[in-house]
Amino acid sequence: LEQRSELVPYRKIMWLSLPRLCLERVFSFLPDRDRKTAALVCHQWHNIMRSPSLWRHRHFHFSGRISKFRKPHYSSAIAYVSHLGAYLERLEVTVCPPRKTQSALRLKGAITRLFSELIRVKAPLRSLAVMNLELDRSAWTTSLRASMVGCLISFLQRGSSKLNSICLSGMRNCIHQGLELLSALSHYETRFYPRCYISSLDLEAFFSGSVNVYLNSSVPDNLSQLQCLTDLRLSYSCLSDELLMALQDDNTLQTFSLHCCLKEPHQQLVCGSSWATLASSCPDLKVKISVNQVVNNDRLARMLLPEIPLSEYCMSAFYSPNEDWSPKPLLSDILPQYRHTLQHLNLDLNNFGESLDEELLELVKVCERLVKLSICAFLEIRTVARLLDMTLTQRSSLKEIHVRRNSNVNLTLHTQ
């Protein structure tokens, strides 16, 4: 007991004597409530808690709903920006899409006040994300949509001059308002270039799912104004030959991610030569494509052209045995085109009535650079064993395998 009592003050002294840098690192993992408690321990900890490095990143969730038992999330968000916004460099706002106009009105008011406060305190934002607004919902009236878009445009005109990463995924604008925002982005870059420029842009589901964006030439024109773009994420409905030509002008693109889903336009024709020119203009380019519920091999072949430098492919396909579709052509004919570039493969298939074991094994065998495989499908146990054997005995590049056979069986394998 005496030894234990001697250890307690010793441990306290050790904590109090830790260097400032170590304490900042430890405190960065604490939630706000624990940070408040830690700030009361001593003067040193109180001073460290005022360090800007602890308050540079923040994520808020806005719902627009009212609770009888606690304050709305946006109240604490606005208070945070008022007191600590001068340190804020990375801000993420995730929205729960409103079902009623009253909720949409509250959301609009909260986001407007948040951005007004960011402008007032001159927050040095480098990264901004506003996700899942879904302005095509009926809860958003015409005036509310216009007000929300105007709020974002106003922030781009009057807010931080240091932004290099912007995410507006899930916004679902009509074509007119979407183009207004894209124009504001290009004007933002024109104002501050070369002192500051946008290098990362996420516009997945930026336009409403019913819009044939690829028919509008203003989208490539605006994106071509972003001269140092290295990371771009779009919905497949935006893809066109004109867009690929616009992206090759500055030779900076390194990661190009495309998301395609059944309910959005995806039947446009894109020339393989356009992809080849882009790949030659941007030698470090890696293309990532995710496909959701497109169960038509002709459409998949039209999208997955051999000229694409595809490094990552994700697909979810839920189909009944009665449907006239099989993933076998995808596994045996289409994906082997990328044997020299494919690094990550993620497949979620409910192949109730057919075996895909041999096709999958052959695909893994021919893909020279495949590092990670994630698959949710009906596979035989011996297939998993053969996959592991490949990684151990055949000098395969495959280092990580995730297999889920059903809701009750999960297997993760890591190899060195």
State the predicted function of each range.
Residues 1-416:
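The conserved beta-strand core of Leucine-Rich Repeat
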